[in-house]
Design a protein with these regions (language model features):
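AAA+ P-loop NTPase nucleotide-binding core of proteostasis motors
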Residues: 1-178
């Protein structure tokens, strides 16, 4: 939605595909002498092709720990260097990372009469246990998403149905839901 509203591309990587150490080469390219050296990396190539984008790293907690070192380079210097030493300019991308770290606390109510810890705070506490401080300190913000209420889901659905109805009307098609 963000990329669409900004009129820029969304580049998405499912980080569960990068759990093993050797998969880092898929992102930035294989080292010299290895198969695929000439191919470059999926991430570095994507950033070079669309430097003005929303880069979504989905389920970041599943990525191999060495990938976080690569991301530190992006967050510190707005540059990502591939296997051949070519630099990808990251100054104009919006980096968003999703995580399910702490999700187990989403449905837990506070325990005890004097409990001051909200589910959001419990979730963020787990995030701090999952990721290293040097990684977390480079993030602009951490946003906790709570379950959508039935009322909110109805509002979203109504809006989407209105938009669909408007598009269909342009093609002289009517939509009737019962």
């Amino acid at each position: 939605v963000l990329a669409s509203e900004l009129g820029i591309s969304l580049v998405r990587f499912d980080m569960s595909e990068y759990m093993e150490k050797h998969t880092i080469a898929k992102l930035i390219g294989s080292p010299a002498g290895y198969i695929g050296y000439e191919d470059g990396g999926l991430l570095t190539d994507a950033i070079r092709k669309t430097p003005n984008c929303v880069l979504l790293l989905d389920e970041i907690e599943k990525a191999h720990p060495d990938i976080f070192n690569i991301l530190l380079q992006v967050m510190d210097y707005a540059v990502l260097t591939d296997n051949k030493g070519r630099k990808s300019d990251c100054r104009h991308l919006i980096l968003i990372m999703t995580s399910n770290a702490g999700a187990q606390y989403a449905h837990q109510a506070s325990i005890g009469f004097n409990s001051q810890v909200s589910t959001g705070q419990a979730m963020l506490r787990q995030v701090k246990k999952t990721f290293k401080p040097e990684f977390l300190n480079r993030l602009s913000a951490s946003v906790v998403f709570h379950d959508m209420s039935r009322e909110m889901a109805t509002q979203v659905l109504d809006k989407k149905l209105r938009q669909l109805d408007e598009k269909l009307a342009l093609r002289h098609v009517s939509l009737h839901l019962t």
